[in-house]
């Protein structure tokens, strides 16, 4: 699963997920899966969606993952009283704003790409849409 190799500090504040996304255009592939809603995407969700897409395209074409989980989420163990410091890092997330391109794909027909992205979108906790590359 994806996570940073090393960080300056192990734990982070919760923060807020406001604003609109950078990385809002398809820049590597021909087709993309773009977020419409906002939320947090865990490393497990990124991997589950990637596997669903890879199986749908039968390992043809090329897939790019445009997001990386760089925020640690901590949890305290069950039945532990409050206090005594912040909990341990349990998993990693990336914060997603509306307009962020999550995955890109090329080398497959549009119908296959749409189907693959639909399977991937079902694994994610927010709404997404299918986009194509615009040539200027």
UniProtKB/Swiss-Prot annotation:
This is Large ribosomal subunit protein uL16. GO terms for biological process: translation. PANTHER family: 50S/60S RIBOSOMAL PROTEIN L16, LARGE RIBOSOMAL SUBUNIT PROTEIN UL16M. It holds the Pfam family Ribosomal_L16. It comes from Pseudoalteromonas atlantica (strain T6c / ATCC BAA-1087). Keywords: Ribonucleoprotein, Ribosomal protein, RNA-binding, rRNA-binding, tRNA-binding. Binds 23S rRNA and is also seen to make contacts with the A and possibly P site tRNAs. The gene is rplP. Disulfide bonds: none annotated. The lineage of its organism: Bacteria, Pseudomonadati, Pseudomonadota, Gammaproteobacteria, Alteromonadales. GO terms for molecular function: rRNA binding; structural constituent of ribosome; tRNA binding. One of its GO terms (cellular component) is cytosolic large ribosomal subunit.
């Amino acid at each position: 699963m994806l996570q940073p190799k090393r960080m300056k500090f192990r734990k982070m504040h919760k923060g807020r997920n406001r604003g609109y996304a950078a990385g809002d255009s398809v820049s590597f592939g021909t087709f993309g899966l773009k977020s419409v809603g906002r939320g947090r995407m865990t490393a497990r969700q990124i991997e589950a969606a990637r596997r669903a897409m890879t199986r749908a395209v039968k390992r043809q074409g090329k897939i790019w993952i445009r997001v990386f989980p760089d925020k640690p989420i901590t949890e305290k163990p069950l039945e532990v009283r409050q206090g005594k410091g912040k909990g341990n890092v349990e998993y990693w997330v990336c914060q997603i704003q509306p307009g962020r391109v999550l995955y890109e794909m090329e080398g497959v027909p549009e119908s296959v790409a749409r189907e693959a992205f639909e399977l991937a979108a079902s694994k994610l906790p927010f709404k997404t849409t299918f986009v194509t590359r615009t040539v200027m």
